[in-house]
Amino acid sequence: MNDKILKILEFGEITKRLSKLAITAPAKEAALKLRPSSNFDQVQNELKQTLALADLLRVKGRLPLTDFQDVHPSTKRLGVKANLNAQELGNLLLVLSLANEINKFLEDVDDEKLNLSAIDSVLDQLDVPDLLFRELKKSVDYDGEVLDTASNALARLRHDMRSNEEDIKNRMDAYTKGNSSKYLSEQIVTIRDDRYVIPVKQEYRGKFGGVVHDQSASGQTLFIEPEAVLNLNNRQQNLIAQEKQEIRNILKHLSSLAREEINSINNIANSLTRLDFLQAKAKLAKEMKASEPKLTQDHSLELRNARHPLIDPEKVVPNDIRLGGDYDTMLITGPNTGGKTITLKTAGLLQLMAQSGLFIPAEEGSKVGVFKEVYADIGDEQSIEQSLSTFSSHINDIIAIMKNVDKETLVLIDEIGAGTDPEEGASLAISILDFLRKKDAKIMVTTHYPELKLYGYNRPRTINASMEFDLKTLSPTYHLQIGIPGHSNAFAIARRLGMREDVVKNAQNLMADEDSDINKMIAKLNAQTKAATTARNRLETSLDRSQKLEQKLQQALDWYNQRVQKQLDFAQERANEVVAKRRKKADKIIAELEKQKNVGVKENKIIEAKGELNSLERQAHNLAHNKVLQREKRQHHVSVGDQVKVLSYGQTGTITKKLSEHEYEVQIGIIKVKVSDRDIERIAKNNAQPKKKLVRATSAIRRSNAHSELDLRGQRYDEAMTNLDRYIDSALLAGLDIVTIIHGIGTGAIRKGVWQYLRSSNHVKGFNYAPANEGGNGATIVKLK
């Protein structure tokens, strides 16, 4: 796609908005570099992936992503046998941790409700190297600090350092707080040359033994290491040297492990960037209230209620724009300032967005083709250096278009043939259009030449269009009318403004008969189009109501059928139980009868009784194996001590208390929750042990209902605190490590309550305000244990 079209249609403004919605630096950069593709399969794949993230954003909320530094420079250094520093290893840990968080976030997504197959290739790269992750997690933190747990030797050294440092402090306190403090410039302990010293007044130098390490600028203060702490300071320096060596050994070991996983690390970083980039696309779609465009193979364009994305949403006027099908060329005629140019730009910009894998601000069902090139000549782009006139610049642009145009090209020309003698300009415009049409291009042009009004009537596959003008308000409505050419409405406007009638009539008489007839025809077409549009809107509204009513009736019927079936199933279950009991009792009776044949009971009576019982058995056979009944029975017969599955959490637990007729208390791990009997299912004892979850390898995975964020805005304080408590329980059960609490700014009461709760919770590892682009002081990021 040529760069000029991106500039003309302001595509860069779209990529800037997209970049701001990304979280990570690599994704922000990718957003700014986004360009339209002319490959059909690639565009289709991009749109499918954007749809997957849009659905995920709608159902589960935002991915648990935070910004991270690009790790590719670090993996390159690993590739040349270099060892990484602690900060670089901390960055690797963050990348692997984010991959783990996303895997957990997606674990319980129901594939029947959310199809993520389009991003399987991205998710499959999030396979975290277990050994490397464990070693990094115990050795460094995200800030690049080496932890005591990195090795036993380091833990021992740091313990000795802290103990020795305490001894030094105690000795120094004797100087700063005891009788010797009067000899000091300040009662403090400071450090010079990595050794603990005290500031001694110069005249009392002899009161202290030891070593002078420094003096003040005036020379009045000497920084002395007292003799009493010399050995302790020496020991501290020795421990520090040992610590540094041990840290070097640890970093070397971790670098060696990371070197074996270079490909995995790069793949994970690339996938995180890709997911962030796709999520930014989904956020932009939500922000613009955009929808997924459907791709067509015939290079047609059908935009329903299309809106220009750079115009204020409160002011923009949506329009239907169609090109292809019955016509390939559209001429938008009429006066200036009516919205012709904006309509042209809307069509072009939405086309570029779609071919970039972005959703477009138009109604669902909108269709676009995939063009090899989009060319435009819009506005005054005359070159000062070449001293070209507006007309010359205009013609130069069109010449360049004519050299490259073909059937896979969309051409947008504003005011074709303008800037010269109207008669010659109109003739040239007609000739240019004829040439472009022969190349089978899709063409949209605007013009104010009246000579072109008949073009749409005497050329095949060509249609006129115009921008609607309200004669009552004497202002444009900015609505595109397809099928009729526009006109100036000069006489009507003059009358409305109070022009003398005789002057207006004289002007009308001065017009050529042909022009007068054309204007009358246009006026008639305008009236007919308005009537047809009103009728169509009325029919569409009626059809929409009918479809919604049909849907509601179908839902009601389905609900009724389900209720009836449940009642029948329950009745059959009870009947099955009765038959089973009777059969067992009858078998005992028959056994007794057979023993008593010699008492006078006839054998044919026994056979007859067996036949009747077997008939009952056959009738009950299906009931005994009815899976629905078995499931219902499990669900409705539970008691304290039973192991159950809590359906809303997807977790197993034990019933600890019956709270009411239909409500139980269930303990899941360390958490107790209140649940309805409709939300639990009893688990048979031999199935009580849950199967170990498998790490995600394909899209066929189950995922929880827990979201990674909670929005408390607009809630009362008590309500917000209750919802927060429940949400933290849900997040812990779902295995989430990082969640976002959105409390807003307002008076600060909710935020204070949230922070007070988090400080008191034993399940919270840490928390802080969200980054500026994720809510700032209006949201809190929480790390769970």
From Swiss-Prot:
Smr domain boundaries: 710-785
Molecular function in Gene Ontology: ATP binding; ATP hydrolysis activity; ATP-dependent DNA damage sensor activity; endonuclease activity; mismatched DNA binding; ribosomal large subunit binding; rRNA binding
GO biological process: one example: negative regulation of DNA recombination
E.C. numbers: 3.1.-.-, 3.6.4.-
Organism domain of life: Bacteria
Keywords from the UniProt entry: ATP-binding, DNA-binding, Endonuclease, Hydrolase, Nuclease, Nucleotide-binding, RNA-binding, rRNA-binding
Keyword check for Amino-acid biosynthesis: no
Known function: Endonuclease that is involved in the suppression of homologous recombination and thus may have a key role in the control of bacterial genetic diversity.
PANTHER family, sorted: OS10G0509000 PROTEIN (PTHR48466:SF2), OS10G0509000 PROTEIN-RELATED (PTHR48466)
Matches recorded under HAMAP family: MutS2
Subunit structure: Homodimer. Binds to stalled ribosomes, contacting rRNA.
Name of the protein in question: Endonuclease MutS2
